[in-house]
Amino acid sequence: MGNMIKKASLIALLPLFTAAAAAATDAETSMESGSSSHLKSFLMSVSMIGLSEIGDKTFLIAALMAMRHKRVLVFSAAATSLAIMTILSGVVGHSAVAFLSERYTAFFAGILFLVFGYKLTMEGLEMSKDAGVEEEMAEVEEEIAIKDMNQDMDDVEKGGDTAYDKQLKNASIGKKIVHRIRELASFMFSPVWVQIFLMVFLGELGDRSQISIIAMATDSDYWYVIAGAVIGHAICSGLAVVGGKLLATRISIRTITLASSLLFFIFALMYIYQAFTTQD
């Protein structure tokens, strides 16, 4: 059990190592080629999402819902919701380039990351070393419990399916295929799936990571930023549904918060440097 926790903790800190590697690569190559620029944007996005989302509200929603429903259903709903939110945020961020030059957007993004870094540093220093996510987890559990009450009647209505299942065994192949397609559609768009989708979507709306994606997408490599964020969200959602509640109670929120602040300060320096070296 201890080894599993250690492995989970290492996986949770993997984005931090990725960010360090991306920063080192950027420092070594001041005059970067197109491919290395794409890779830098991609790794920055993955690392930012990884550190921002571990233990976040959307992470806890996926972790707690996975204890009540099928993990595949929870993962598909959470990952789809976050992917759509990320794509919309990226498109909104890149559209700002139409009104401002790349130099100004990079400068504003750098200032934004400085503010985020400062706020996270203050939050981290005010936390105790043993600070956890118990309070936020209790809030999410209460929210889920209220919404689950509306699903109880649906579970009762499924009691008469045995007779239909017997008829299906004797049905033709065509009818069986149609039934499987209908089952898949009802699985993907079931009330539970929609509930998880909306809870994650609304939980991410206006979040620090969403605003960061908007800022990062002002760069010319915005599709790589979007791709990195989508993959980062998918990794975090996967961790959440597999063992998110255990992981969230074992990691140090103070450490994650301070590591995130350091990452935002690094991003701020990179974007401000880009603002002063970019030629319009």
Curated annotation (Swiss-Prot):
GO molecular function, one term: manganese:proton antiporter activity
Pfam name, any one: GDT1
UniProt membrane topology term: Multi-pass membrane protein
GO cellular component, one term: fungal-type vacuole membrane
Transmembrane segments: 4-24, 46-66, 72-92, 105-125, 184-204, 223-243, 256-276
Record's subcellular location: Golgi apparatus, cis-Golgi network membrane
Leftover remarks: Present with 2170 molecules/cell in log phase SD medium.
Protein name: Divalent cation/proton antiporter GDT1
